[in-house]
C-alpha cells in the first residue's frame, strides 16, 4: 500500500496539539486593519481550536500529524 500524502496547504494552516486537538490561526488579521479597532485586532491574536464538525476532515488531510 502506498504512503498517504499530506495536503501541504493544510499542514501550513493547522497544528496538532499534544492533547490531540487541532489549532488554527484567526482569520481577518492580514490586511484592511486600519478600520478595525485595537480591541478587535487584539482579540484576533493567537491560535484557537478547530470546530468539532471540521476536525474529521482536517485529520484526513494530515495523516501523519
From Swiss-Prot:
GO terms for molecular function: structural constituent of ribosome. Coiled coil: none annotated. It comes from the Bacteria. One of its GO terms (biological process) is translation. Keywords: Ribonucleoprotein, Ribosomal protein. NCBIfam families: rpmI_bact (TIGR00001). This is Large ribosomal subunit protein bL35.
Amino acid at each position: 500500500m502506498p504512503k498517504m500524502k499530506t495536503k501541504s496547504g493544510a499542514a501550513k494552516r493547522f497544528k496538532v496539539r499534544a492533547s490531540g486537538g487541532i489549532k488554527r490561526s484567526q482569520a481577518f488579521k492580514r490586511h484592511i486593519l486600519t478600520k478595525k479597532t485595537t480591541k478587535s485586532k487584539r482579540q484576533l491574536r493567537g491560535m484557537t481550536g478547530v470546530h468539532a464538525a471540521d476536525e474529521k476532515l482536517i485529520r484526513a488531510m494530515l495523516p501523519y500529524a
